[in-house]
Amino acid sequence: MSKRPVKQERKEPETTGHSWDGIEEYNNPLPRWWLWVFYATIIWSVGYTIAYPAWPLVSSATQGILGQRAAGDTRLDVARDIALFEEANTEIRSQLVETPLTEIAADPALVDYAQNAGAAVFRTWCAQCHGAGAAGVQAAGYPNLLDDAWLWGGTIEDIHLTIAHGIRNEEDPDARWSQMPAFGRDQLLTDDEIAQVVQYVRLISDQEHDETLAAAGEEVYLMQCAACHMDDGTGDPFQGAPNLTDAIWLYGGDVETLTETVYNSRFGVMPSWQERLSEAEIRAVSVYVHGLGGGVESAETMQ
């Protein structure tokens, strides 16, 4: 097979001389100027990577012989901005830490700073569970922080303690702790007794219920549940025992969900934040959560 270009008839394009099953290739090389431009871009790109920051390394990048910082170097920019922010807010952050929790509300400037800083902390660390709007996720047992139904108390001191130490967090000895028995799994109650007490809970929470089962469930409730949830079902924030008489449920108030709760118990865990957040950040987010709408006034504030 010939390797030499073949001249075709007049006005027909030249081919390379190659043929594959009768198919020939036109001999149409790129223009010289295009090739020289292509070569020039290669040379320019190599020169650019030598002159300016370009090649990534393990913990940084080549800086370039011209010593210029890449535009928009986010690591340096962020570090600088954080340093400037910390410097600008040093005084008010110190004031936030030094002011007693119950007296923060009396300082409008301090409240304004705490609300804004707390909102940023909440979006970064808390919204993953409690939702961006703080309404919680009932299916997963993440509490709604917008209402006034608090498991462990809703004063600013209560909220601060909960955030700082967490709930049922084994890593922090000062974490809030409570344990609901698994009445069915541990065979503390029979299936019939569980069905009865579930109907009684629906009775005291003003939901549709079976009157016969609810009447029998009252005795079961007083024997097994009232020690934590109180005789009237209003709960005990000191133990983290929820109020069973309102329409606010951590996991749900339907028969199926209540049966699951009584049978297998619940064991929600909240991490301790005192090792991850500064005291100023914990106080700021405490003020923010307290001000979402359900915060309870502390006894000291009311005096």
Residue ranges and their predicted role:
Residues 2-109, 153-158, 162, 181-201, ...:
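Periplasmic c-type cytochrome electron-transfer domains
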Residues 110-136, 147, 153-155, 160-161, ...:
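Sequence/structural segment immediately N-terminal to covalent heme-attachment motifs in c-type
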Residues 140, 146-201, 232, 236-294:
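Extracytoplasmic electron-transfer domains, predominantly the class I c-type cytochrome c fold
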Residues 296-300:
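Core catalytic loop region at the nicotinamide-binding pocket of NAD(P)H-dependent oxidoreductases
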